[in-house]
């Protein structure tokens, strides 16, 4: 008996979630965690069983493979998904569950008293009566991005010789959540396609071909230590210097006070002791001019505060992380056009959004490979209340399949 598509997707998704593959920003290695090696090995073995060609798993836990097409004139389409889940201080182990939403608050974990409150997450109200996948509230769900891994692998399993399509090339990469490290290291000679897609984040219908420009900055401060009994006119407290630096930035241009296409500067980490302090900063903006100005302002603030504390030593660095996909859109817009035509065929209403984040596609688009993004169907990423309506999960799969088949007809 043929298993229902919803069951096929859910069963595979749960199997992938059973492999703990949280990334670790503090690790200098690629991948940053051993669990990602395990995830990559699992996928490589499944690809072998499915009969794909050119399967390669490298030392960085990047897996690439090709499903040969039967339409030689069709474009080569790529799908890139990431195998890590995010570390936000929750458990690295994910315990998924299927619950039917009846319209009331949902108990995710009775033992720990964890509830999803509809007043706090009103977006769930549109899924009344539906089956939805949640974690048990002790971790993220990991639909970001294992729902996408599931969609792609299920497509590769289900395509038959009767389905007309071009070559489909897949890449499963590590450490997206800690700076797109895997995508940046991907050899595009291995991922040789005409255009590609990520399936990362986003509720049903959402399409992304515009995202933040992103940079990171670090400011290092060395003060002057002294015993408090003789500190007058001697001691330079690096924590106070750090406070003065932070105070130079608008409190309204932060993630919690901005939306849409508004950019921000976000102080993400601070370590300090009586001798030194370090600040870490995330810089985000859609507009290229504003983005450059925000990066330059870091240096202006350091110069200003250095003048106030001439005996302190203050240094800084700014590093670009990824750029706006829209910067890379040229005359060939087939990748984007196929999303919309395929959505129309499936009666899915598109919702184009400027993504206040980035995907592996941002790294690839910067290298000249246009890689727009569309939905998995999930909500509340990076949260214990992340959830994935199964109906939306199915639609994500159907869209992925339709894109591949429609491209061969164009």
From Swiss-Prot:
Q: Where does Zn(2+) 1 bind?
A: 82, 144, 200
Q: Top EC class per UniProt?
A: hydrolase
Cofactor binding: number and manner: Binds 2 Zn(2+) ions per subunit.
Q: Which cofactor does it need?
A: Zn(2+)
Report the GO molecular function annotations.
metallopeptidase activity; tripeptide aminopeptidase activity; zinc ion binding
Q: Which residues constitute the catalytic centre?
A: 84, 176 (proton acceptor)
Query: Could you tell me the EC number(s) of this protein?
Result: 3.4.11.-
Tell me the Pfam families matching this sequence: M20_dimer, Peptidase_M20
User: What InterPro entries does the annotation carry?
Assistant: ArgE/DapE_CS, Bact_exopeptidase_dim_dom, Peptidase_M20, Peptidase_M20_dimer, Peptidase_M20B
Q: Name one GO biological process term.
A: proteolysis
Q: Which keywords are on file for this protein?
A: Hydrolase, Metal-binding, Metalloprotease, Protease, Zinc
- Where does the chain bind Zn(2+) 2? 144, 177, 382
Q: Which family does it belong to?
A: Belongs to the peptidase M20B family.
* Name this protein carries in UniProt: Peptidase T-like protein YPO1009/y3403/YP_3421
Question: What organism is listed for this UniProt entry?
Answer: Yersinia pestis
């Amino acid at each position: 008996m043929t298993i229902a598509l919803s069951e096929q997707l859910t069963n595979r998704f749960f199997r992938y979630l059973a492999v703990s593959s949280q990334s670790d920003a503090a690790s200098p290695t690629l991948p940053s965690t051993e669990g990602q090696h395990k995830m990559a090995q699992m996928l490589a073995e499944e690809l072998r069983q499915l009969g794909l060609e050119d399967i390669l798993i490298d030392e960085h836990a990047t897996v690439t493979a090709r499903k040969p097409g039967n339409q030689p004139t069709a474009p080569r389409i790529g799908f890139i998904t990431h195998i890590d889940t995010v570390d936000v201080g929750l458990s690295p182990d994910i315990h998924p569950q299927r619950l039917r939403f009846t319209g009331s608050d949902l108990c995710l974990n009775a033992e720990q008293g964890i509830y999803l409150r509809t007043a706090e997450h009103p977006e769930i109200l549109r899924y009344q009566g539906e089956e939805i996948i949640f974690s048990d509230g002790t971790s993220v769900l990991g639909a970001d991005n294992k729902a996408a891994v599931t969609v792609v692998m299920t497509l590769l399993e289900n395509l038959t010789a009767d389905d007309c399509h071009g070559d489909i090339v897949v890449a499963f990469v590590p450490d997206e959540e800690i700076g797109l490290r895997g995508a940046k290291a991907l050899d595009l000679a291995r991922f040789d396609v005409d255009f590609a897609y990520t399936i990362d984040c986003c509720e049903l219908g959402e399409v992304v071909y515009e995202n933040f420009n992103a940079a990171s900055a670090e400011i290092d401060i060395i003060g002057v230590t002294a015993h408090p009994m003789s500190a007058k006119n001697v001691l330079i407290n690096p924590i106070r210097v750090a406070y003065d630096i932070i105070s130079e930035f608008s409190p309204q241009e932060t993630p919690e006070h901005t939306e849409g296409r508004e950019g921000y500067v976000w102080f993400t980490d601070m370590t300090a002791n009586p001798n030194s302090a370090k600040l870490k900063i995330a810089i985000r903006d859609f507009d290229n001019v504003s983005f450059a100005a925000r990066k330059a302002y870091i240096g202006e603030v350091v110069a200003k505060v250095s003048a106030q504390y001439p005996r302190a030593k203050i240094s800084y660095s700014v590093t670009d992380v990824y750029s706006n996909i829209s910067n890379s859109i040229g005359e060939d817009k087939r990748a984007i056009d196929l999303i919309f035509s395929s959505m129309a065929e499936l009666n899915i209403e598109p919702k184009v959004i400027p993504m206040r984040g980035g995907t592996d596609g941002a790294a690839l688009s910067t290298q000249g490979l246009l890689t727009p993004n569309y939905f998995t169907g999930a909500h509340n990423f990076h949260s214990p209340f992340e959830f994935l309506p199964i109906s939306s999960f199915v639609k994500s799969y159907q869209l992925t399949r339709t894109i591949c088949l429609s491209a061969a007809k164009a």
